[in-house]
Amino acid sequence: MAKAKFERSKPHVNVGTIGHVDHGKTTLTAAISHVLAKTYGGEAKDFSQIDNAPEERERGITINTSHIEYDTPSRHYAHVDCPGHADYVKNMITGAAQMDGAILVVASTDGPMPQTREHILLSRQVGVPFIIVFMNKCDMVDDAELLELVEMEVRELLSEYDFPGDDLPVIQGSALKALEGEPEWEAKILELAAALDSYIPEPERDIDKPFLMPIEDVFSISGRGTVVTGRVERGIVRVGDEVEIVGIRTTTKTTCTGVEMFRKLLDEGRAGENCGILLRGTKRDDVERGQVLSKPGSINPHTTFESEVYVLSKEEGGRHTPFFKGYRPQFYFRTTDVTGTIELPEGVEMVMPGDNIKMVVTLICPIAMDEGLRFAIREGGRTVGAGVVAKIIA
C-alpha cells in the first residue's frame, strides 16, 4: 500500500489533550478527528483506535500514547492522547510528545479535579506554552449558572499556575454529542479548532533558533586543527561564524573555519544534520564531549536548577528501592553524565520507584542549559529516572 505523501505546505503544530481521568479526553480526540475530517477532509479515527494506544519506549520508559493527525484550512496538527495518568506524567517529563499547546478537558459535571491540577502544574513545569480549555459534557448540565461557575473555577486554577486564566479560550461543548453527529455540538468542535488556529502561535522552527550543537567527539587533524562532531540541535552554523564552547569548563570563543558532512566540505551545517566543525586555534585538549558549540551569548552554563522528575518503576528496569536526600546519581545531559546531588521538597523524606517528584539538583560542574532541557538520571550507566529542567537557579 502506498504511503500518503506528507503535506509540508501547511504549518505543522503539535498539540495534545490533558485533564482528569474520565473527563472525556479520548472522546474529544475522536470528536475532533471526525468533525474535522467531515468538514475539511482527512481520515477519521474512532474512539477504539485512539483508546487502544500502542506502547512506546522513550529512554527506556514504557509509555502508552496515541498519535492522530488532523487538518484545519490553515494548519496541520499532530495530536497526542494518553490512556492513563501515569502515561501523561511520563510523556510530559520525557518530552516524548512535545506540545506547542494543550487542550485541557474538564467535565462540567465535575469541575476541576486533582489530575486537572496536576496536569496544569506539569504543563507549567515542562514548558507547555499555551492551554485552551474544552469544558466537556455540557449537554448534561441544564443550569447556565453552574457552567459559568465551573468556567470561573478552571480560569482561576490556570491563573494560579501563571497561565493567563482570564484571557485564554474556553469552549463549552459535548464531545460525545459531536461524535454522534449533532450539529450544534459539532459546531463547538469547529470553534475549538478555530481557537487552536488563532490562539496557539506557529512554533518557531528549530532551524530559525540560535545555533547549538552538542559535542559528541573531538579529533585533531594535522595541519588543519581541531574538529568537533555532533548533530546540530538547532539553528545553522556557517563557515566564518563566531561560536562559543559552553559547559564543563570556562566558556571560550572560537571561529568555525569549516563544516563537513560525509567527508564533503559544506558552507553550513543545519538543524538535524550530523556534521564535523573545524575550529580555529582550538587545541584538542580544550574541548570535550558534553560541551556544546553555540551562537555566542545564546546559552549559558549552570549547575543548580529545579526539575520535575519521573523515577522509573522496578518493572521498567529502574531501582527496586527508594532513594533519600543526599542521593548522588549521574545526570545525563545530551551527550554526557555529570554527578549531582538532590534536594527534595519539604516534608518529602524518600522517593519511591514509579513516583514523579519536584527536586532541586546541584551538579558538580556546569552544563549548558535552558529551561525545558531533558535529562536522564543514571546509576552506573543504567537509567533510573527522567527529568526536565523547570527553572534555573544558578
UniProtKB/Swiss-Prot annotation:
Annotated spans, G2: 60-64
UniProt-listed InterPro entries: EF-Tu_GTP-bd, EF-Tu_GTPase, EFTu-like_2, EFTU_2, G_TR_CS, P-loop_NTPase, Small_GTP-bd, T_Tr_GTP-bd_dom
UniProt region (G1), positions on chain: 19-26
Subcellular location as annotated: Cytoplasm
Transmembrane portions of the chain: none
Its biological purpose: GTP hydrolase that promotes the GTP-dependent binding of aminoacyl-tRNA to the A-site of ribosomes during protein biosynthesis.
Protein's recorded name: Elongation factor Tu 2
